[in-house]
Amino acid sequence: MAVEPDKPGVDDPGPGRRLGLDVGTVRIGVAVSDRDARLAMPVETVRRETGFKDRDKDDIDRLLDLIHEYDAVEVAVGLPRDLKGNGSSSVKHAKEIAFRIRRRLAKDDRMKEPPPVRMVDERLTTVVATSALRASGVSEKRGRSVIDQAAAVEILQSWLDARHFALNGHSPSNVGDEVREP
């Protein structure tokens, strides 16, 4: 199941906050960026309610409310892939939620122009998020309640870093570094 993620910087909506989503079968982790689109921060974990054959439920409504609340100019939905880049079995869930958000935003008259909903490569984000939580001393029980938010932060931060590189030719970590001749 080969599914290609979107490329940052293409049709970029410009400055503003971005929302990042880690879609699971039980929960959806949510993260938001600062207005400069440099730093991702956790927001909340939304309980997943909408299935493939269901009408939109409270989870979709909550995600739309967050898009409006943060005035998001772009939404980055994690695209689960294995290390070879192939889509995992969870791809269908992420694509379904992205589709429903796009559809609802297109009909939403609260926004002049709906923000683009991007599919973002999320390889190893949950592994990285879990390791970071354990390293910071978060208990396994407490970790379950925030792991989806941490994964959403990883997804969004990777998108922000790649976006910055695509638009500026360097990563945010070396902003201000000078290239010195030998």
Curated annotation (Swiss-Prot):
GO BP, sorted A to Z: rRNA 5'-end processing
Any one GO MF annotation of this record: nuclease activity
CDD domains the record matches: YqgF
Enzyme Commission number(s): 3.1.-.-
Chief location category: cytoplasm
UniProt-listed PANTHER family: POLYNUCLEOTIDYL TRANSFERASE, RIBONUCLEASE H-LIKE SUPERFAMILY PROTEIN
Species this protein is from: Corynebacterium aurimucosum (strain ATCC 700975 / DSM 44827 / CIP 107346 / CN-1)
Keywords carried by this UniProt record: Cytoplasm, Hydrolase, Nuclease, Ribosome biogenesis
GO CC, any one term: cytosol
Protein name: Putative pre-16S rRNA nuclease
Function: Could be a nuclease involved in processing of the 5'-end of pre-16S rRNA.
Record family assignment: Belongs to the YqgF nuclease family.
UniProt-annotated location(s): Cytoplasm
